[in-house]
Amino acid sequence: MTIPTDNNSSNNKGYNDNNNNNNNNNNNNNNNNNNNNNNNKEHPNINNNNNNNNNNNNNNIKESSSSNSNHSSSQSSSTATVNSNPKVYPYEIIKQVGQGTFGKVYEAKNQDNKRVAIKKVEKSNHFISREYDILKIVAHPNCLRILDMFYTAEDNKKMQNLVFDFIPYTLASLLKKRQLSINFIKVLFYQLCQAIKHIHSKAICHRDITPNNILLSSKGELTLADFGSAKILESNHTSMSYICSRYYRAPELLVGCSNYTTKIDIWSIGCILAEMLIGKPLFPGTNSNDQLGRIIEVLGSPTKDDMEAMKPSKPYHLQLPNINPKFFESLHNVEDKTVVDLLSKIFIFDPVKRASIDEIIAHPFLRDVNINSLELFDEMKCFSVSGNGKSSLTTNSTSSSSTTANMTSLASSSSNNKTTCSETYLSRLPTSAITSSSNLKSIDNSNNGKSSSSSNNIPSLNNSNNGVITNTI
């Protein structure tokens, strides 16, 4: 597994946005934090006093002090200690292999000398409990399996340790090394779809599907990882729109929709499929506006009905030239036209009309997939030997970062294709931006149809809020 070591890793998804619903719950229920955690309604700004009094949260997981740190998990329990040599009983730390927004990732070995990955995150973090709760109910061969969870005291901080199987490679590192055959793409995409089908059946939305979060064994067995952004979506609850890595972000998120569905994951896996086909991201936007512009350049201009279906954060019209779709032109080198047809059913502005995961699995492109044929492919052999004769575990990513290290997806990581928190202010595109982006204009209904900006600017989608898209978690 690989993890980007990007300096912008902490400025990824706007995790500090306010959630009014959760604020109300926290004000009224300071003594009932158990209920809030079990219902996935935590707020990132809960004060430390509440956190310190919340020692029996996370579905009755029992924690103990550092002097007696017996821990419990769904699968095993042990005593956790920390010393100057990073050794966490019964796991021996081998080395740090990555660092993400919320924690560090270590390669370790257990008492049976089996390699595992340990993701260490500070306990006070808002997303910790949700990630662990979701991991406990996810049980599928193509989803990352949690082996253990325990707490340690380190540098006067309470750390949550999540233990996973160690899986050495990512789809990002594979795409950096070689072009994939169409049949191997089918097998990988089929496995990814099975993982998505499983989590969507539980109303879980992953919300950050990227090549770096797709792990691969040496045989090509696929595992969906990094559930740090995952959430169980409820129809009567809003969620933050500033989520998901930019290249793989659905258009409804780009216009500030806060009542989205699991169809945002469908868009993401469509981007993954296209990237496997052409060897690079299909929509490599430089910021949120450029991202939307690049999508429009390929798919054509959204209709008025499309805009309404995407539920933008504020009522506005999108005024731009009548851009004809260039979708088939973008994929003209792809010989298998069934996969192009499948992508045309995924890349649809209206989330309701976008293909469901069941429709994707039933599509002719995946009709004859033989999941037991992995041994017939040689794509994974590119990792077998490096120049020094050792197994090559560290590679660069074509889609996410300029520098990567092992175990990307275990940390809630960030990369160059993710925007910073300050980018909620929608700014003017650079001169290198594509034409369709530079012609986007927001028109506020209260402005009597007058453009709120010059033609070479992309103004806020929320003019009444000084350009800031208000998000909820």
UniProtKB/Swiss-Prot annotation:
The keyword Glycoprotein does not apply. Keywords: ATP-binding, Kinase, Nucleotide-binding, Serine/threonine-protein kinase, Transferase. One of its GO terms (biological process) is regulation of myosin II filament assembly. It comes from Dictyostelium discoideum. Signal peptide: none annotated. It catalyses: L-seryl-[tau protein] + ATP = O-phospho-L-seryl-[tau protein] + ADP + H(+); L-threonyl-[tau protein] + ATP = O-phospho-L-threonyl-[tau protein] + ADP + H(+). The gene is glkA. InterPro entries: GSK-3, Kinase-like_dom_sf, Prot_kinase_dom, Protein_kinase_ATP_BS, STKc_GSK3, Tyr_kinase_AS. Pfam families: Pkinase (PF00069). The keyword Cell division does not apply. The active site is at residue 208. Belongs to the protein kinase superfamily. CMGC Ser/Thr protein kinase family. GSK-3 subfamily. Its EC number is 2.7.11.26. Residues 91-366 form the Protein kinase domain. This is Probable serine/threonine-protein kinase glkA. GO terms for molecular function: ATP binding; protein kinase activity; protein serine/threonine kinase activity. GO terms for cellular component: cell leading edge; cytoplasm; nucleus. It comes from the Eukaryota. ATP binds at residues 97-105, 119. Residues 1-84, 389-418, 437-473 are annotated as: Disordered. Residues 7-84, 442-466 have a biased composition (Low complexity).
